[in-house]
């Protein structure tokens, strides 16, 4: 079965949230394989995280990962920004 690379944009709930603790929690997600996490400065000290996961190309993979992300304390929002099929 083919695999897809799913990239999310995660915004913290507040400016003073510890981004490193969110990053550590993301690394513990077992729903899919974590490929990388990038930090994206937004404004006024606010930093978004852009984790990319590798998952099987079956319906609902992105939704399952998103559910896991939203359970993490300190995350204000999590949305899919890119899905790419891997060869």
Model-derived features with residue positions:
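Long, contiguous binding/interaction regions
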Residues: 1-87
């Amino acid at each position: 079965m083919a695999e897809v690379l799913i990239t999310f944009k995660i915004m913290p709930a507040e400016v003073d949230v510890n981004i490193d603790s969110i990053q550590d929690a993301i690394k513990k997600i077992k729903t899919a394989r974590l490929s990388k996490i990038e930090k994206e400065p937004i404004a006024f000290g606010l930093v978004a995280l852009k984790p990319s996961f590798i998952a099987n190309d079956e319906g609902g993979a992105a939704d399952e990962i998103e559910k896991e992300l939203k359970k993490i304390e300190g995350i204000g929002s999590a949305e899919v920004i890119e899905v790419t099929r891997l060869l």
